[in-house]
Amino acid sequence: RIIEPIAGGPFIVMTWNYPGTIGIIAVDANGHIAVGTSTN
């Protein structure tokens, strides 16, 4: 599993890459969370 936390501006973004799946979690300064996944 590959996890890359990226801090920039008001957002903290974490991406991970499973076999055939890419996921993204984004958290803003207010604690709102956005999650995205895609299967290739």
Curated annotation (Swiss-Prot):
<comment type="function">
    <text>Cleaves the GlcNAc-Asn bond which joins oligosaccharides to the peptide of asparagine-linked glycoproteins.</text>
</comment>
<protein>
    <recommendedName>
        <fullName>N(4)-(beta-N-acetylglucosaminyl)-L-asparaginase</fullName>
        <ecNumber>3.5.1.26</ecNumber>
    </recommendedName>
</protein>
<dbReference type="GO" id="GO:0003948">
    <property type="term" value="F:N4-(beta-N-acetylglucosaminyl)-L-asparaginase activity"/>
</dbReference>
<dbReference type="GO" id="GO:0006508">
    <property type="term" value="P:proteolysis"/>
</dbReference>
<dbReference type="GO" id="GO:0008233">
    <property type="term" value="F:peptidase activity"/>
</dbReference>
<keyword id="KW-0325">Glycoprotein</keyword>
<keyword id="KW-0378">Hydrolase</keyword>
<dbReference type="GO" id="GO:0005576">
    <property type="term" value="C:extracellular region"/>
</dbReference>
<comment type="subunit">
    <text>Heterotetramer of two alpha and two beta chains arranged as a dimer of alpha/beta heterodimers.</text>
</comment>
<dbReference type="InterPro" id="IPR029055">
    <property type="entry name" value="Ntn_hydrolases_N"/>
</dbReference>
<keyword id="KW-0964">Secreted</keyword>
<feature type="active site" description="Nucleophile">
    <location>
        <position position="21"/>
    </location>
</feature>
<keyword id="KW-0068">Autocatalytic cleavage</keyword>
<comment type="similarity">
    <text>Belongs to the Ntn-hydrolase family.</text>
</comment>
<keyword id="KW-0645">Protease</keyword>
